[in-house]
């Protein structure tokens, strides 16, 4: 794996359940991994006992003072502080590129086979190659970040999947040369790709690969308590506040419905017209 790259696993309150670490190694990743733990985590010492120098700590209050929570709640329960700390942490460990991952991934998969046919193939030895290719894409294009797809991106199977989507959620390949800030205590990934995408910044999801994540609220720790306290109703309205011209509230689900945001992409981001539509010049 390239030496200027590292993986940051953002984790809180569950040192015995960092599934992502084990899955990365099982998938063939040979590079550096760091667990990003905040200074308010009561289980921080247990992380250090298990992972030693692979644990990086940051001050939540310092990060909060430099960003927009999107609310006035009197607490700091959110992953957003860890997300925004990663650029400083990357410089600290001498990395130019990094990927932010949550701590509860059970698998990484390729969604197309070698003949470019729609498939589902578990990654067992080529994780270095996947992450290196995402870094090269970041290097050679003007994107702010690139994400690995999630299961919901493939609803509709081969009829619904496409090779690129103009959003980024959950995993983020970033560079210290192109820093940006996540905004909003909840729904921070959506708030960020919509509010910055609105200004022409590029966020992409690569559909060639997918990560599998535990269902929200299934495991204690992380953001579970925040979601249980406020629910998806409050969560979705953060994005309405940041981008009211292109966000509305709806419901999703089959039998058990829940409130969720809906993005109108026609209003959300600038689009590039084909050159054939350009007006002639005198």
Sequence positions of predicted segments:
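C-terminal catalytic/acceptor-binding lobe
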Residues: 2-5, 15-16, 184, 190-282
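Hydrophobic targeting segments
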Residues: 3-9, 24, 31-35
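Short hydrophobic segments within beta-strands
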Residues: 8-10, 36, 101, 206
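Short, well-formed alpha-helical segments that are part of the catalytic scaffolds
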Residues: 9-28, 40-48
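A short acidic (Asp/Glu
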Residues: 18-21, 44-48, 109-112, 156-162, ...
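Active-site-proximal specificity loops/subdomain of glycosyltransferases
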Residues: 38-99, 106-119
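A structural signal for short, well-ordered beta-strand segments and their strand-loop junctions
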Residues: 97-102, 144-149, 203-207, 248-251
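Conserved catalytic core of nucleotide-sugar-dependent glycosyltransferases
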Residues: 106-195
């Amino acid at each position: 794996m390239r030496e200027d790259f590292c993986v940051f696993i953002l984790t809180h309150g569950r040192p015995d359940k960092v599934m992502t670490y084990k899955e990365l190694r099982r998938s063939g990743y040979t590079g550096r991994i760091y667990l990003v733990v905040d200074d308010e985590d009561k289980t921080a010492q247990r992380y250090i006992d298990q992972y030693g120098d692979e644990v990086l700590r940051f001050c939540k209050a310092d990060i909060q003072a430099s960003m927009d929570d999107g609310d006035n709640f009197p607490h700091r329960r959110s992953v957003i502080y860890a997300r925004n700390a990663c650029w400083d942490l990357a410089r600290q460990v001498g990395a130019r590129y990094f990927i932010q991952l949550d701590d509860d991934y059970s698998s990484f998969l390729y969604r197309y086979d070698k003949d470019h046919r729609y498939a589902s193939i578990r990654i067992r030895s080529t994780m270095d190659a996947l992450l290196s290719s995402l870094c090269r894409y970041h290097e050679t294009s003007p994107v702010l970040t690139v994400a690995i797809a999630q299961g919901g991106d493939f609803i509709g199977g081969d009829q619904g999947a496409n090779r690129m989507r103009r959003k980024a959620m959950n995993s983020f390949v970033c560079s210290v040369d192109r820093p940006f800030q996540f905004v909003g205590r909840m729904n921070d990934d959506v708030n960020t790709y919509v509010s910055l995408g609105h200004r022409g910044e590029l966020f992409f999801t690569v559909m060639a690969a997918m990560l599998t994540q535990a269902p929200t609220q299934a495991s204690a720790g992380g953001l579970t308590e925040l979601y249980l306290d406020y629910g998806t109703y409050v969560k979705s309205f953060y994005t309405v506040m940041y981008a009211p011209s292109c966000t509305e509230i709806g419901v999703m689900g089959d039998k058990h419905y829940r409130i969720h945001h809906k993005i109108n992409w026609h209003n959300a981001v600038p689009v590039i017209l084909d050159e054939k539509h350009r007006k002639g010049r005198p």
